[in-house]
Amino acid sequence: MLDEKSSNTTSVVVLCTAPDEATAQDLAAKVLAEKLAACATLIPGATSLYYWEGKLEQEYEVQMILKTTVSHQQALLECLKSHHPYQTPELLVLPVTHGDTDYLSWLNASLR
């Protein structure tokens, strides 16, 4: 169970999809090597449905869940966007309002 000390307003989760596992691995390795994210979770097997240029698309994708801090967020987003093969990649930032104190401390210590 989480206690009041686990409140946090400096960590964020970034969602990004990639077209395949190799691309997701490459993007994750890049942001981890540059210390822009502390952890990247890659979930293969996602199917995304969306309209693009007036046409319904359905694509196999890998969902990436990246953990970082607010202070690293912009650099992470810029890195992902500049190295991503999509013209308009999914880049969504979700605030972390609570989390395990030890995990959040590790997350902060893992970044540059």
Curated annotation (Swiss-Prot):
Q: Which cofactor does it need?
A: Cu cation
What processes in GO biological process is this protein linked to?
response to metal ion
Question: A single GO molecular function, which one?
Answer: copper ion binding
Record bears the keyword Protease: no
Write the record's keywords in alphabetical order, separated by commas: Copper, Cytoplasm, Metal-binding
On cofactor binding, the record's note says: Binds 1 copper ion per subunit.
**Family assignment?**
Belongs to the CutA family.
Q: How does it assemble?
A: Homotrimer.
HAMAP family this protein is in?
A: CutA (MF_01160)
What is the name of the protein in this document?
A: Divalent-cation tolerance protein CutA
Q: What is the lineage of its organism?
A: Bacteria, Pseudomonadati, Pseudomonadota, Gammaproteobacteria, Enterobacterales
